[in-house]
Curated annotation (Swiss-Prot):
It catalyses: ATP + H2O + a folded polypeptide = ADP + phosphate + an unfolded polypeptide. Pfam families: Cpn60_TCP1. Keywords: ATP-binding, Chaperone, Cytoplasm, Isomerase, Nucleotide-binding. One of its GO terms (biological process) is protein refolding. Belongs to the chaperonin (HSP60) family. One of its GO terms (cellular component) is cytoplasm. SUPFAM superfamilies: GroEL apical domain-like, GroEL equatorial domain-like, GroEL-intermediate domain like. The keyword Aminoacyl-tRNA synthetase does not apply. It is found in: Cytoplasm. This is Chaperonin GroEL. Its EC number is 5.6.1.7. The gene is groEL. The keyword Transmembrane does not apply.
């Protein structure tokens, strides 16, 4: 395949054009008065969104060189979204500002590598300044404020996220789903839930709700299949003597074993229920261990030299209550020791840090959350499917921003933290003229997000920038929603430190690569010689088909 190569200024101009197209489409969504972007879908109604990364992901340009520039900026949005979960539009605006200024400097004959060094020095200084201004999130109200800002001022969403986090803890699983109704609601499942239901409807104790409810049950955890209850008879007799219900969790319970349990349950001799163990393979083993730690029991495993015949009551787990539907099992208030659970949580956290697979990380985080305290589901409602999808985007953003705020703290919002960091960057002095130019590029780029937020609100950006920079108050800034100056933290206009920091670092990283690009290579467009050229003689070769016998 032939390639097309572009060099120097021509390459950078093409790339900058791609950066501008993508950034201009994304940046209209920034701030409380940002506009929507409508995206055509191959089927169904168009999608309306104010989420920067969703807009960025949809953009593919026809010109391959312009498209390379756009794809690099898309990479910034995706990276920021993966790391901090929000701040994608801010990162895109910063990238565009840095690349524009950088391209001008390179065109003026400056050394791109020195410019990049200057950019890196300035970004380090800006990040230190932002981190210094950061303050920890203490109250539930502050959590709600962060959520509200990220959800574009919808306080209902902010309050719901704060409530979910207070119920399941900061480590807990909070998932976002589309509701079937108009209302947005919060559903909290306390305790540990896994997606396996009862193996037989004969175990049901509450026929109205079609659920199995066991109070103060003993829990038998077995890692293999159970086909016969013969080896279990000693422990079953001990359970009957204790008068407590029994929950059996095993890889599977088949044939005679299941039939015997059902018969005993129906005769009233033994209050029992059985479910399959969650997960597959090694993950199943790990989840059984989690259940053992949570319930204060032991996994009955031949690897550990424990046989079913030798199981005693003190090897069984215990819980306050177990509820089983046809799809889920929930164990509430397991009897595991607090220090054992904490040790297990610490172990899973270490595994999360060590793993490189996103899928493994997600599964480990699910396990961590289940151990740490529960699952909350925010069901997002709306009048139409398009509205539900648009709101769900915003709830996802708000949830990610809130987690980031709890992790690293908060700074004044509305682009103010970045603007204030430009003061610290402005104090940097380098002897090398080109490195100094790189520092100045960042100093000017740090103004871009607040300018864009203000301009989206229909106000002149440079006036606001000047007024905020002149102020001596720590949290002074511009409220674009009300179009007035105020103490941003007091007004609840705050951004997570992690989001602001990540947006700047990711933007500078990709922009540095774009500025130092000197050549671009893409597939050359195919030359179209006309379709008929490949078949001379008007398909004469098919003349012999006349004698074919059909």
């Amino acid at each position: 395949m032939a390639k097309e190569v572009k060099f120097g200024r021509t390459a950078r101009e093409k790339m900058l054009r791609g950066v501008d197209i993508l950034a201009d489409a994304v940046k209209v969504t920034l701030g409380p008065k940002g506009r929507n972007v409508v995206i055509e879908k191959s089927f169904g109604s168009p999608r309306t969104t104010k989420d920067g990364v969703t807009v960025a992901k949809e953009i593919e340009l026809e010109d391959k060189f312009e498209n390379m520039g756009a794809q690099m900026v898309k990479e910034v949005a995706s990276k920021t979204n993966d790391t901090a979960g929000d701040g994608t539009t801010t990162a895109t605006v910063l990238t565009q500002a840095i690349v524009r200024e950088g391209a001008k400097s390179v065109a003026a004959g400056m050394n791109p590598m020195d410019l990049k060094r200057g950019i890196e020095i300035a970004v380090r200084t800006a990040v230190e300044d932002i981190t210094k201004r950061s303050k920890k999130v203490k109250s539930n109200d502050e959590v709600a404020q962060v959520g509200t800002i990220s959800a574009n001022g919808e306080s209902e969403i902010g309050a719901m996220i704060a409530q979910a986090m207070s119920r399941v803890g900061n480590e807990g699983v909070i998932t976002v789903e589309e509701a079937k109704s108009l209302d947005t609601e919060l559903d909290v499942v306390e305790g540990m839930q896994f997606d396996r239901g009862y193996l037989s409807p004969y175990f049901i104790t509450n026929a109205d709700k079609m659920v199995v409810e066991l109070d103060e049950p003993l829990i038998l955890l077995h890692e293999k299949k159970l086909t016969s209850l013969q080896p279990m008879l000693p422990v079953l007799e001990a359970v009957v003597q204790s008068g407590r219900p029994l929950l059996i969790i095993a890889e599977d319970i088949e044939g005679e074993a299941l039939a015997t349990l059902v018969v005993n349950k129906l005769r009233g001799g033994l209050k029992v229920a059985a479910v399959k163990a969650p997960g597959f393979g090694d993950r199943r083993k790990a989840m059984l261990e989690d259940l053992a730690v949570l319930s204060g029991g032991q996994v009955i495993s031949e690897d550990l030299g424990i046989k079913l015949e030798s199981v005693t009551l003190d090897m069984l787990g215990k819980a306050k209550r177990v509820s089983i539907t046809k799809d889920d099992t929930t164990i509430v208030d397991g009897a595991g020791k607090k220090k054992d659970i904490e040790a297990r949580v610490a172990q899973i956290k270490r595994q999360i840090e060590d793993t490189t697979s996103d899928y493994d990380k997600e599964k480990l985080q699910e396990r961590l959350a289940k151990l740490a305290g529960g699952v909350a589901v925010i069901k997002v409602g709306g009048a139409t499917e398009a509205e539900v999808k648009e709101r769900k985007d915003r709830v996802d953003d708000a949830l990610n921003a809130t987690r980031a705020a709890v992790e690293e703290g908060i700074v004044p919002g509305g682009g103010t933290a970045l603007l204030m960091a430009s003061k610290a960057v402005g104090k940097l002095v380098e002897d090398n003229r080109d490195i100094q130019a790189g520092i100045n590029i960042i100093r000017r780029a740090l103004e871009a997000p607040i300018r864009q937020i203000v301009e989206n609100a229909g106000v002149e950006g440079s006036i606001v920038v000047q007024k905020v920079l002149e102020s001596k108050q720590a949290n002074f800034g511009f409220d674009a929603q009300k179009e007035e100056y105020c103490d941003l933290v007091a007004a609840g206009i705050i951004d997570p430190t992690k989001v602001v920091r990540t947006a700047l670092q990711d933007a500078a990283s990709i922009a540095g690569l774009l500025i130092t690009t000197e050549a671009m290579i893409a597939d050359a467009p195919k030359k179209d010689n006309g379709a008929a050229a490949g078949m001379p003689g008007g398909m004469g070769g098919m003349g012999g088909m006349g004698g074919m016998d059909f």
